[in-house]
Amino acid sequence: MSEILCTICARGGSKGVKNKNIRKINDLEMIAYSIIQAKNSKLFKHIVISTDSEEIAKIALKYGGEVFFKREAHLASDTAAKIPVMRDALLRSEEYFKCQFDTLIDLDASAPLRSSADIIKAFETFCQNQNDNLITAVPARRNPYFNLIEVQDGKVVKSKSGNFTTRQSVPKCYDMNASIYIFKRDFLLQNDSVFGKNTGLFIMDESTAFDVDSELDFKIVEFLIKEKNLQAKDF
């Protein structure tokens, strides 16, 4: 049976929304949603939290996350990319648990609107298509062929050229929602991008488009969770 590691990466120094990973939405800290969803999926023996914050670590432990290392400062800066953080968590986990994981599934702590069913279906898609890695996305509300623009040399131009006059006629585009990342071990260790020759895509519901990077994002996510009256059992 394959060994699947779940990682949840949550640093303490969030700038757009202060302490966002432990701010409460509907009586649950934001990071708690991802931990509960991971547990409810029944896919994981280990749910490992990568954080530089003692407060985040304490709260994660309360909900069943495993915290056995402190993320190093260079991996917790504003400029730190996420793939090295996930790679670090994988290697530390293999050393700690004395095993080798075949697959890593990362749940973004700032994207609490997924469900455990989303995690399961994304993993099933990954396995069925024999992908090296998989990303999640939602149908894009804006399209570079139609209504996204750039300013080049002082002139306003479409982001991508094309003679399209209706939204229905343009090629389908998707908006990465940063909710779920799945990697084969070797792909994660050997690549610094989520885009490869055999990258899979799992399309999620439009309501999962929001990951919390601003106060407006937080208010929208809070509204959606409260509007649906979502509780821990619902994930």
Curated annotation (Swiss-Prot):
Transmembrane segments: none annotated. GO terms for molecular function: N-acylneuraminate cytidylyltransferase activity. InterPro entries: CMP-NeuNAc_synthase (IPR050793), Cytidylyl_trans (IPR003329), Nucleotide-diphossugar_trans (IPR029044). It comes from the Bacteria. Gene3D superfamilies: Spore Coat Polysaccharide Biosynthesis Protein SpsA, Chain A. Disulfide bonds: none annotated. Required for biosynthesis of LAH modification in the post-translational modification of Campylobacter coli flagellin. Belongs to the CMP-NeuNAc synthase family. This is Post-translational flagellin modification protein B. The gene is ptmB.
